[in-house]
């Protein structure tokens, strides 16, 4: 004769009060988590990694602007570098060209990429701005975490030998392209630079959360472009996945093309050229020397 078995608890036949209690507890837990998430506030006062430690600031004086805390590191590897910060004075009437940088982190994953804008003055001075996650010490970036108020946003103003150099000379997998932008048309380059600088100052006063979908390098570039030239960049998946941007760049005539899109992509790769730079010449001139931008067509 088998021993009597204790009846199993059927969750669908629990007393009404118990079901209600479990549901209420779960509901309140979700509400608490949402409220806690929404209560998080971004800050400019944390223990930042060295290359994100200082935040740039622009001081306007008529047509002149002084940009403080421009990064000018000398990178030997991603962890070995000489730290240097400089102030740079520019004349806003002398903005001559804008350059667009597209860095694929891994060529096998073409959706994921980083975008940078670089401003060239009539005297050849170039200053780049990389819109990034502002990392704390010991912190690593992950796109999923970027959805949940885990990183602040920063506009990193830097020399090209720093912000482009570290990508082309120190990263083994990444592939970096350099295009001359024609996104705004003549005369609007100054307004684009001013838009960037004013947003930089705003972030210094009111920090913001980075968001993997809504507040990234590329979504901010598009906002700046459309602020200066409304409707210039249409809505597209490539804004969320910047690695897909070459076709939208071609379709909307946003960069100078040198042949077909495939030929332009191949000719715009600057990694090997950057690796051969000896340091005796200007880095920006060196990576552009064989690009033939002046012979390209829109």
Residue ranges and their predicted role:
Residues 65, 76-176:
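Glycine-rich catalytic cores of cysteine/serine-nucleophile enzymes that process amide/ester linkages
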Residues 60-64, 120-124, 184-189:
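A short, structured loop/turn motif at beta-sheet edges
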Residues 10-27:
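N-terminal Sec-pathway targeting helices
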Residues 30-43:
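Internal alpha-helical transmembrane segments
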Residues 23, 32, 59, 64-65, ...:
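Charge-rich, low-complexity N-terminal segments
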Residues 160-200:
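A structural motif
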Residues 40-57:
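Alpha-helical transmembrane signal-anchor/signal-peptide segments
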Residues 21, 184, 195-298:
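Activation targets extended, charge/polar-rich intrinsically disordered C-terminal tails
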């Amino acid at each position: 004769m088998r021993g009597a078995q204790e009846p199993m608890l059927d969750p669908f036949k629990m007393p009404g009060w118990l079901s209600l209690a479990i549901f209420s507890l779960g509901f309140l837990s979700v509400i608490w988590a949402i409220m806690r998430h929404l209560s998080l506030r971004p800050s400019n006062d944390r223990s930042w990694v060295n290359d994100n430690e200082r935040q740039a600031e622009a001081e306007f004086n008529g047509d002149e602007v002084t940009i403080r805390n421009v990064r000018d590191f000398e990178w030997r590897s991603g962890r070995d570098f000489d730290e240097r910060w400089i102030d740079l004075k520019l004349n806003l009437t002398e903005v001559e060209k804008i350059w667009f940088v597209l860095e694929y982190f891994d060529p096998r994953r073409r959706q994921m990429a980083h975008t940078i804008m670089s401003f060239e003055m009539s005297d050849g001075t170039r200053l780049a701005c990389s819109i990034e996650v502002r990392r704390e010490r010991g912190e690593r970036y992950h796109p999923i975490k970027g959805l949940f108020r885990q990183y602040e946003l920063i506009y990193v103003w830097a020399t090209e030998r720093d912000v482009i150099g570290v990508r082309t000379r120190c990263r083994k997998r990444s592939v970096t392209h350099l295009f001359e932008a024609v996104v705004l048309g003549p005369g609007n380059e100054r307004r684009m630079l001013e838009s960037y600088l004013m947003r930089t100052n705003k972030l210094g006063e009111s920090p913001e959360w980075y968001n993997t979908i809504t507040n990234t390098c590329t979504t901010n570039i598009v906002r700046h472009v459309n602020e200066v030239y409304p409707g210039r960049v249409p809505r597209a998946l490539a804004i969320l996945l910047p690695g897909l941007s070459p076709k939208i760049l071609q379709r909307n005539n946003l960069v100078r093309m040198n042949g077909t899109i495939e030929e332009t992509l191949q000719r715009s790769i600057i990694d090997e050229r950057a690796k051969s730079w000896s340091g005796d010449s200007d880095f920006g001139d060196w990576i552009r020397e064989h690009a033939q931008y002046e012979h390209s067509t829109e």
